[in-house]
Amino acid sequence: MRLLLQNPYLLILFALLLTTPSGFSQPTNPRFDAEADLLLSHFDSKTDVDDIHSVAAFATIMSSEPFSQINHHAVAGAYGIQEGLYVPANELFEAAFGERWSDAHTNFNQALSEVAELVSETLETGGDVWVAECGQSDFTAALVQEIQSVHPDLDTSSRIHVVQHSNWNESSATPEKLKFVQGNTDYHKIPDGNAVGNGTPGFNTADSIDWKDSISDPKLISLWETAIAIANRYNGQEGRYLNHNISVGGFDFSDMAEVAWILNQEQMHNAEVFFITFGK
């Protein structure tokens, strides 16, 4: 190490050797086991349209190497007690995930049954379950209760991991359901994904981004065009929350700070870096 400090050229070479070609970090102790675990993203889509951008961002991550083989599933309509209208985006979920999504807005019980089956399959084969709580914890509470009823001997506090970044999401959940999730899962409250420089990525910006310069997959380009169109259509409409950054042509997929954290990619700085990293 003394030699490295004395020779700046060796120090630069050493730093380059530690940098992975793909741009992704290579953690020594990864949180998520890509070969065994299940990754769930629960979107509320009520009433902020940021979840619409987040759906496209989640699909982008799951399409990229080295994450394209991850077992994943999305849930729409995983909202809590907040007032206001839902943002319908079934065509986006279908384009993003195919059969890998469930509609809790239209049929809560069916969605619960579908996701519980996936969770049980993962747990029974030795994997853990990770939930990116992109909305409130009401659906997750029902899911954990269902798993406990089917697997009464399972310690859900060590096998089901829930990641939440938003104080507002927590305050908009049914209080007793949030408390249940916090007490019956491995619950992680991480820094807010709306800001940069706090330990997680800041995926909320008013800045326009030349995202098409970074994404090469035509399907992903179409997916983002659909997401942007839906978000613009419903943003601030009929009493829905007005997302300022989206209204001026920016981006808000702040919930994806949770997925970045789960996958040990929390060093990613902002939305522009996201597109450069995952759009390859």
Regions inferred by a protein language model and the residue ranges of each:
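Bacterial Sec-dependent signal peptides at the C-terminal "C-region" and cleavage site
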Residues: 18-28
